[in-house]
Regions:
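Acetyl-CoA-dependent GNAT
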Residues: 20, 26, 39, 43, ...
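Conserved GNAT acetyl-CoA-binding A-motif
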Residues: 157-168
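Acyl-donor-binding surface of acyltransferase catalytic domains
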Residues: 1-51
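Conserved acetyl-CoA-binding loop-helix of GNAT-fold acetyltransferases
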Residues: 142-155, 178-182
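Conserved beta-strand-loop-alpha-helix junction that forms the acyl-donor binding cleft
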Residues: 134, 167-177
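Polytopic endomembrane small-metabolite transporters, centered on the Drug/Metabolite Transporter
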Residues: 80-82, 160, 171
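Structural motif
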Residues: 160, 182-184
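Active-site acidic-Proline motif in GNAT/NAT acetyltransferases
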Residues: 137-143, 171-172
Length: 184
């Protein structure tokens, strides 16, 4: 009788990494990760009927990119300047338009109201949907849109077999900490 060869730790890790990369590649090969999630195409408040769309950052129209950079600077420049990272507009633009970046965009009547910048990635050995940004215009905050967008991201993560959503929040951004804490 022949003994079955046991895989070494290195072989097991290589096999796991290959499976993870296949999941990331499959998620990134999608045209629109939101497409089959019908309940996340529209969000209705008392004042707005908001459409959600999902596109690759590299496919975003110039007016969309311009608005994204503008809202990032309006909402986050001070936080970055107060951190050890500092604010570097060119570096932020490069991050926001990186090859693997996706946008979840909320708009109403051709007006941009919010966006999330995210990627399907590997973080600390896990396949994740990494939420780099969630930014809303001030007039739409505290109306449930941020929660709705995070639910859409969670559903996209689940649909694509990502283990979790990962994000980073500045310690000084108390409202964001409270928001994400309430989401669990």
């Amino acid at each position: 009788m022949q003994k079955k060869a046991r895989k070494t730790r290195r072989q097991l890790l290589a096999s796991k990494a290959a499976v993870q990369q296949q999941l990331i590649n499959k998620a990134n090969a999608l045209t629109n990760p939101l497409e089959t999630l019908d309940k996340f195409h529209e969000y209705i408040t008392t004042d707005y009927t908001i459409k959600l769309s999902c596109i690759r950052a590299k496919d975003a129209q110039p007016e969309c990119l311009s608005w994204i950079f503008d809202i990032m600077e309006r909402n986050m420049k001070d936080m970055y300047e107060q951190s050890t990272w500092g604010w570097d507009a060119a570096e932020k633009q490069a991050e926001l338009t990186e090859e693997m970046a996706w946008y979840l965009i909320a708009s109403c009547n051709d007006k941009f109201l919010g966006f999330s910048h995210f990627r399907f990635d590997i973080d600390n050995g896990d396949v994740v949907l990494y939420c780099y940004e969630l930014q809303l215009e001030s007039e739409i905050r505290r109306k449930g849109l941020g929660r709705f967008m995070m639910s859409a991201l969670e559903s996209m993560a689940y649909q694509n077999q990502m283990l979790k959503i990962v994000l980073t929040v500045f310690k000084r951004n108390l409202s964001a900490i409270q928001f994400f804490y309430t989401l669990g």
